């Protein structure tokens, strides 16, 4: 599988500067629009996009992170290359990001539960403490963490 770069009107992502291996520590920064893959190895490994995550689903984002996580877990090789395959025009509002609100934190908790399993509460807490002065400014990290815990519980209890 190859992760390509994207040209953007208003760059928000760090540009790739060299070919590098995508691993468990950095797969979360690449979205689905950047992926190119051969279908057969993915099918043989029994991997598909999770239907409860992504635009229009119960959990509004994270389908690409779960997909890459599953690919790496099954041993598929993923490379990031500094070649742009598309140009993104940021001329319409996001279909899933409406700000750092209740739904955002709930969905993020669900994503953490799906990827990290029993470690999800610790990852959520780490994220809240790490970004506490930035994205949790309005909500406060404790309230955001509580909403993430609700999302984690909803995945664990099968109320997806």
Give the ranges of each region predicted by the language model.
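Short beta-strand-to-loop element that shapes/binds the nucleotide-sugar donor at the catalytic cleft/hinge
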Residues: 1-17
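A conserved hydrophobic position in a structured secondary element of the catalytic/binding core
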Residues: 37, 63, 81
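Conserved nucleotide-sugar donor-binding
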Residues: 31-51
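Acidic donor-binding loop at a coil-to-helix junction in glycosyltransferase catalytic cores
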Residues: 54-66
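Hydrophobic residues within well-ordered alpha-helices
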Residues: 70-72
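Short, P/G- and charge-enriched loop/turn segments at secondary-structure junctions
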Residues: 20-27
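Catalytic beta-strand/loop signature of glycosyltransferases that borders the donor
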Residues: 49-51, 75-87, 100-101
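Non-catalytic, C-terminal membrane-associated alpha-helical segments of glycosyltransferases
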Residues: 99-160
